Amino acid sequence: MFRQVYNLLEYLKFFLYGLIQGFTEFIPVSSTAHLKVISLFLGIDDPGASLSATIQLGSVLAIAWYFKNDIFNFRSQSSKKLIAYLLHKRLLRSILIGTIPIVLLGGSIKLFVPYFFDNVLRSNLSIALVSFLMAFFMYLADSSRRGSINIKNHNYSNSFLIGFFQAFAIFPGVSRSGITISSALISGWERGDAAKFSFLLGIPAISLAAIVEFISSFNDFFALGFFPLFVGLITTFVSSLLAIDFLLKYFSSNGLKIFIIYRVIFGIVILLNL
């Protein structure tokens, strides 16, 4: 009986981590910070690299599924569909170009400073301060004039600039979606397309992070077992779909104000519990 209760608690833990990852990966509040802080507050173990890789995969699958027509829409190059085809190819190139900065920065840190994130940058104090900084950056973005850049008319320099800011998401507490959406708004993107491009840009970025986690914890996958990881994967996939759909609809008529307030409150709560 005790064994059954223990297994149930393990499944609930994986379910909880999946929910947190799915919702906070796309809502601009930082999934890494929430996974770390909530695990500390609830007194449960850090999710670990193997579970992190699995739930990140769930987020990637959710993006790919939600935007499958944008990603996999390789139609024939008939004259009627030529413009759509060319726009599709340019979007894929833009995503690759926007991924370059985070690959360079993340790869350099992994190679030359492998224990970079095992220090003060992962502390609760650091996460709280980063949350305040992100709230200010998001405030600047929300206060900027509405732009006219979108998925169809953007250029490669636009995507590289957003990718440059995305690279800072390797620091715990930043929020990949938060910094990419905010930088897009500041540089003149329309709200809805800023969020959409941010999510699409997350496919290679989150995938690379999952691959790194997978390689570093390959043996742990067998120790955790298939079914607990599957629970985390499915939970993340479903909650990610809900988060993406919510945010795209929310951004059609709203700004970042509610998330700015949340990030300030989140930072204060962390400081009060140091």
Swiss-Prot record:
This enzyme catalyses: di-trans,octa-cis-undecaprenyl diphosphate + H2O = di-trans,octa-cis-undecaprenyl phosphate + phosphate + H(+)
What enzyme class is recorded for this protein? hydrolase
As for membrane topology, the entry says:
Multi-pass membrane protein
Q: Name one GO molecular function term.
A: undecaprenyl-diphosphatase activity
Keyword RNA-binding part of the UniProt annotation: no
What keywords sit in the KW lines? Antibiotic resistance, Cell inner membrane, Cell membrane, Cell shape, Cell wall biogenesis/degradation, Hydrolase, Membrane, Peptidoglycan synthesis, Transmembrane, Transmembrane helix
Q: Give the Enzyme Commission number.
A: 3.6.1.27
Gene Ontology CC: plasma membrane
Q: Which domain of life is it from?
A: Bacteria
> Can you cite a GO biological process for this protein?
cell wall organization
* Compartments where located: Cell inner membrane
- Tell me if Cell membrane is a UniProt keyword of this record: yes
Described by its record, this protein's role is as follows: Catalyzes the dephosphorylation of undecaprenyl diphosphate (UPP). Confers resistance to bacitracin.
Belongs to which family? Answer: Belongs to the UppP family.
Extra information: Bacitracin is thought to be involved in the inhibition of peptidoglycan synthesis by sequestering undecaprenyl diphosphate, thereby reducing the pool of lipid carrier available.
Q: What is this protein called?
A: Undecaprenyl-diphosphatase
List the source organism.
Answer: Prochlorococcus marinus (strain AS9601)
